Each structure stands twice: as structure tokens, then as C-alpha cells.
């Protein structure tokens, strides 16, 4: 039996999604909780491996099991065995053609900037603090250069293991909600650190340090060293993963919860 789950987590206390020896990971915690409920070892496959400090409201995973359990066992039962900063949002049996990573047609991220002179206290792990006068409208205009299938070498991490730098960005918008500036970006897939590297460069435009044409210039240069520093991890959320309609997976509010959809 193959089960898909929708997962939400606060990544601030973990060394990323991927299971690692001797450090705490989201995957490790989930597999441990699922194995207790299934009464057998469980291995997970995810839609997107988030880095240390990065969060998710719409992560999707799947696993194989011989255990026969009702939906409540895979949601309430698993949640009872998880730490408070990880939660299963939904569970659904899927056919063997479904794969959390390879069946996905798009991933969507939101990056939340807290734009204020003073750092936040309560939301310090859930937003990235940047002071100065950030012009979200300029960031939005500049970001449109990212649309379509392009070579994103300038925005990939040096240690990125992808065989190709090409990705297809479906949509990108930058908006302001009071003190928050939100970068919302969707693509078929993302390179390692791609979203945070894009945000880092957009911030330079929003702060008036670079012209509106800079994103297009960076794409043409194909040189990571010419782009801005990587933005902080704590404002980044994986909010949605898109799959073909045939799987009929639940669609919930994107979040994070303190933001307007």
C-alpha cells in the first residue's frame, strides 16, 4: 500500500529535511513516528528537500507499508508521536504510479521578509529580518525577467548537484503586506539555494543598490559570483506542490498561517 501525506513543519530546529546520522532532521522524526504507527520500518520520499532552517506548509511525502490503518492513524496517530514543530495535515492512499518527487509538476515557495528597523522577537524563526526602505514594486518588476525556462547558473549554489542549471519558472510576484514583503515563486523544480539566491539579489534591487535590469543581467552572466549573497533561511517556506489531477490530493490554505492567501 502506498500512502501520501501532506506535511507542515518549522524547520528552525532541524538540519534540513534529509535524514542524517547524528543530527536531527525532519525526515528522521517523521520516519520514526510513522514506524511506530505502522509497527514496521518506514522510509519516506519527499517532493522537495528543504535546507536547515527552512519551513514547509505544503510538503508532500509518500511511503510504502504493509500496515492496514485508517486515515486517522496516519494523521492523528502520527501527530501524537511527533514533536510539536512537525505536523501531518492530511493522508491519502495513492496508486503505485504516484511518486512525491517525480510525479510533481510544480513547486511553490514563499519567502517572508520582515521589513522593520528592529528585529522581531516572536516570529524570529519564521521570517527573515531586513531593515531599510525595501521597494516591493521594484522587486516585482525586476523578478519578471526570471519567467520561463532559463539557465539559472547565477542563482544555484556552488555545491548544487543538479545535472542541468535549466529550470522553468511559472510565476513570480513580490507583494507587501504591512511590514512584510513576500516573494512568491513557482517553478517546475528548483536548484539548490535557488530561491534564497534569487531573493538575495531582488533585495539589492528593492533597497536601491542595483537597477531594475539587474536580474536579467545576472541571468545572462551565468556566474554565481556576480549575484548577491544568499538570503537567510528562516523566511523560506515550501507552500505547495502540484500534481496531476488524477491523484486528487487535498488542497489546503498555503500559509504560513500569519499571512493572507
UniProtKB/Swiss-Prot annotation:
One Pfam family of this chain: PseudoU_synth_1
Entry keyword set: Isomerase, tRNA processing
Catalytic activity: uridine(38/39/40) in tRNA = pseudouridine(38/39/40) in tRNA
Molecular function per GO: RNA binding; tRNA pseudouridine(38-40) synthase activity
BP GO terms, sorted: tRNA pseudouridine synthesis
Keyword set includes Isomerase: yes
EC number from the UniProt entry: 5.4.99.12
UniProt cross-references to InterPro entries, sorted A to Z: PsdUridine_synth_cat_dom_sf, PsdUridine_synth_TruA, PsdUridine_synth_TruA_a/b_dom, PsdUridine_synth_TruA_C, TruA/RsuA/RluB/E/F_N
Gene3D superfamilies reported in the protein's UniProt record: Pseudouridine synthase I, catalytic domain, C-terminal subdomain, Pseudouridine synthase I, catalytic domain, N-terminal subdomain
Protein residues bound to substrate: 109
Active-site positions on this chain: 51 (nucleophile)
Top-level EC class: isomerase
Subunit structure: Homodimer.
Function: Formation of pseudouridine at positions 38, 39 and 40 in the anticodon stem and loop of transfer RNAs.
Family statement: Belongs to the tRNA pseudouridine synthase TruA family.
Listed HAMAP family: TruA
Protein name: tRNA pseudouridine synthase A
Organism annotation: Shewanella sp. (strain MR-7)
Primary gene name: truA
Amino acid at each position: 500500500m502506498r500512502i501520501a501525506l501532506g506535511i507542515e513543519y518549522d524547520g528552525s530546529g532541524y538540519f534540513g529535511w534529509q535524514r542524517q546520522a547524528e543530527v536531527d532532521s525532519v525526515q528522521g522524526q517523521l520516519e520514526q513516528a510513522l514506524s511506530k504507527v505502522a509497527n514496521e520500518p518506514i522510509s519516506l520520499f519527499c517532493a522537495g528537500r528543504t535546507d536547515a532552517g527552512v519551513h514547509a506548509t505544503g510538503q508532500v511525502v509518500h511511503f510504502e507499508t504493509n500496515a492496514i490503518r485508517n486515515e486517522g492513524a496516519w494523521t492523528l496517530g502520527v501527530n501524537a508521536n511527533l514533536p510539536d514543530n512537525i505536523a501531518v495535515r492530511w493522508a491519502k492512499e495513492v496508486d503505485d504510479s504516484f511518486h512525491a518527487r517525480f510525479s510533481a509538476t510544480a513547486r511553490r515557495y514563499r519567502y517572508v521578509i520582515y521589513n522593520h528597523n528592529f528585529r522581531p522577537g516572536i516570529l524570529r524563526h519564521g521570517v527573515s529580518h531586513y531593515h531599510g526602505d525595501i521597494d516591493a514594486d521594484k522587486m516585482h518588476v525586476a523578478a519578471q525577467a526570471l519567467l520561463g525556462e532559463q539557465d539559472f547558473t547565477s542563482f544555484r549554489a556552488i555545491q548544487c548537484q543538479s545535472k542541468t542549471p535549466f529550470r522553468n519558472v511559472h510565476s513570480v510576484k513580490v507583494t507587501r503586506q504591512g511590514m512584510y514583503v513576500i516573494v512568491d515563486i513557482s517553478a517546475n523544480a528548483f536548484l539548490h539555494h535557488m530561491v534564497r539566491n534569487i531573493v538575495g539579489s531582488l533585495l539589492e534591487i528593492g533597497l536601491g543598490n542595483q537597477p531594475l535590469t539587474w536580474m536579467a543581467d545576472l541571468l545572462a552572466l551565468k556566474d554565481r559570483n556576480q549575484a548577491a549573497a544568499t538570503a537567510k533561511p528562516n523566511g523560506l517556506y515550501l507552500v505547495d506542490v502540484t500534481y496531476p489531477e488524477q491523484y486528487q490530493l487535498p488542497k489546503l490554505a498555503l500559509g504560513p498561517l500569519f499571512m493572507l492567501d
